[in-house]
Curated annotation (Swiss-Prot):
This is Glucosylglycerol phosphorylase. Its EC number is 2.4.1.359. The lineage of its organism: Bacteria, Pseudomonadati, Pseudomonadota, Gammaproteobacteria, Pseudomonadales. Might be an attractive biocatalyst for the production of the osmolyte glucosylglycerol, which is currently produced on industrial scale by exploiting a side activity of the closely related sucrose phosphorylase. GGoP from M.adhaerens may offer far higher productivities due to its high specific activity in the synthesis direction. Glucosylglycerol is commercially distributed as a moisturising agent in cosmetics and can also serve as a stabilizing agent in protein formulations, or even as a functional food. It comes from Marinobacter adhaerens (strain DSM 23420 / HP15). The gene is gtfA. It comes from the Bacteria.
Amino acid sequence: MLLKNAVQLICYPDRIGNNLKDLYTVVDTHLSEAIGGLHILPFFPSNADGGFSPLTHKEVDPKVGTWDDIEAFTAKYDLCVDLTVNHISDESPEFTDFIANGFDSEYADLFVHVDKFGEISPDDMAKIHIRKEKEPFREVTLSDGTKTRVWCTFTEQQIDLNYESDLAYQLMESYIGFLTSKGVNLLRLDAFGYTTKRIGTSCFLVEPEVYQILDWVNQVALKHGAECLPEVHDHTSYQYAISRRNMHPYGFALPPLLLYSLLDANSTYLKNWLRMCPRNMVTVLDTHDGICIPDVEGVLPDEKIKVLIDNIDARSADPIMRRSAANIHSVGAIYQLTCTFYDALMQNDDAYIAARAIQFFTPGIPQVYYVGLLAGCNDHELMEQSGELRDINRHYYTLEEVEQDIQKPVVQRLLSLMKFRSNYPAFDGHFELNYSNNSSVAMAWRHGDYYCHLFVDLNFKTVKVTYTDVETGETRHLEC
């Protein structure tokens, strides 16, 4: 494994302070012993979706910093960066060249031209997995007045790439080579499941094409000294498929599983999952997205999922729903719950520390989202200003707020756990799920003479961590 076996921080380039320099100051001052890496969300020039509509992956948005700022991180920490494999901005040089030169553009085949599919029947439209309140197509007018349609899964500004063309692979390889030259060693493959377009299917995670694309990206990344973290929210079986392909899967089932376990004081389903979950995961409790429900389907019974949703609903903004391209106004089951993880646990410090302790003892590399690091609460004001439901969990912290919140008792307890997880050698060894009753969890790690054990009582939300001091041979207790 190329990555340090340590906690990583997930953060925006401009929401802990104003820019990358501010972020580095906070990390170096408060977190240097607590983390081994960072996932810095998109810092590229972008015109939509909070950075996820990049004009290029070869520039840093000057509003947040320079490549020197990025390389300051990579000199000391692992760095995960988003590679938006599905789309690029409509303001990118490639798409603006297509608008100017039409189908004579050297980049014309880089995009998915909807009209090549002919008329799409209502039945086929109904199958397409969509992410907005309209069909995933956009009509554009070329400079000569010709109108044509291109595929755009997300916002109108995010134009999907055509993986039936060599141009898409050439673009991705150039991005991967450039990012790794700056020290990036983990590529988060954003929205990769939407790269497959085959009418008559969901156009989402279509096999075998999706794995052919993934395997190619992973091969190129490994050649350049980086690993891959494909991002997909769907049935947990996809995470196993990713793991088998020598890539890191997300442990996206863990957040809803832990919420259910702590709110209902029932560890049965959590322990069932821990017995079989991939061992090379990246685990999260919170991210810049909401708490996704599809990831836990098949792990939690449907009636337990309903109990969880009903419990959290009062502390969440409106949920994000699943939609059909045939009828954009019809909604299916809940896709994401929108609230901070701390609020989901009713701002209960002990429950929150219990959740983090279980995350840190779960196999894989743990990531902590910046709002979660500071035990942040729902930012209703930002959400109402932007109209984006997920902004409830995307607070802009001033440096003064960080200095204040980092001293909160719950945050100091979390930092103690993070330092232990990032530095105690037992986590380089073997995972053990020990026997416990259905209202508790017992987990351990062993590596040579190093041994650590976690016991969590889900009723009382108490956490007990013990570990071996190899210098004295004594068993010690971690204050958390």
